[in-house]
């Protein structure tokens, strides 16, 4: 992948398909499954360009997958997950040190019948060594929560991500796939049941963090 100096691609990031069916978001529900060593081991062996893989750590086999990926120099990252504190801690112990699209398609504080239950978000905040990635377009994650991420995780623990689609920087008349629409500065499923990705470019993220979330330009 890096043989041509004019195409210095650092690696591939896989998002799916070992995800929580309850947190599918815009992922295809029928493709979601538990980790299968017979499937993922040949992929890692045959494609050393894979450098990061998004996984829900609560799935059966996810801890074994995280340990395997870490041994191969691949970063297992938490995403599309219903994990609670114990799941996140166990994941962290086997190599899940990063969170993809923090707050999006993951559990937060919720009720389980009459009891309260922490979610992935609160659990990640409690682990100092876990870094997060946020889609900082001001829509995927509201401004007050962007402020909270920066306040708790800081500049060293936070990465900005566009999650940009091929229609990034386009207008509402640009996207032709009938499954999606562009509306109010973001891509959505056509039935508006979930966000489907961003149309933001990195400069928009920087402006959002500086002008609305109060982060210094240097830190942003």
Annotated model-derived regions:
Residues 20-21, 34, 108, 167, ...:
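Generic structural "secondary-structure junction" signal
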Residues 1-49:
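Divalent-metal coordination cores built from histidine and acidic residues
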Residues 36, 40, 62, 202:
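Aromatic/hydrophobic pocket-lining residues that form the small-molecule binding cavity
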Residues 40, 146, 206:
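Generic structural marker for isolated residues within well-ordered, non-membrane alpha-helices
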Residues 116-134, 150-162, 168-220:
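His/Asp/Glu-enriched, well-ordered alpha-helical/loop segment
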Residues 45-169:
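Active-site core of metal-dependent hydrolases
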Residues 14, 69, 99, 209, ...:
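Conserved, mostly hydrophobic/aromatic
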């Amino acid at each position: 992948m890096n043989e041509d100096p004019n195409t210095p691609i650092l690696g591939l990031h896989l998002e799916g398909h070992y995800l929580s069916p309850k947190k599918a978001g815009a992922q295809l529900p029928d493709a979601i499954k538990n980790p299968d060593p017979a499937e993922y081991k040949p992929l890692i062996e045959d494609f050393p360009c894979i450098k990061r893989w998004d996984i829900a750590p609560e799935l059966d086999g996810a801890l074994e997958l995280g340990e395997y990926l870490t041994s191969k120099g691949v970063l297992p990252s938490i995403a599309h997950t219903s994990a609670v504190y114990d799941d996140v801690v166990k994941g962290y112990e086997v190599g899940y040190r990063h969170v993809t699209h923090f707050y999006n398609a993951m559990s937060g504080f919720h009720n389980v019948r009459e009891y309260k239950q922490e979610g992935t978000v609160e659990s990640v905040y409690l682990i100092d060594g876990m870094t997060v990635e946020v889609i900082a377009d001001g829509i995927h994650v509201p401004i007050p929560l962007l402020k909270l991420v920066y306040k708790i995780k800081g500049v060293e623990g936070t990465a900005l991500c566009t999650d940009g689609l091929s229609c990034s920087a386009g207008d509402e008349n640009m996207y032709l796939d009938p499954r999606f629409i562009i509306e109010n500065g973001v891509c959505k499923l056509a039935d508006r049941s979930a966000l489907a990705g961003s149309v933001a470019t990195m400069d928009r993220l920087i402006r959002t963090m500086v002008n609305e979330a109060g982060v210094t330009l240097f830190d942003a």
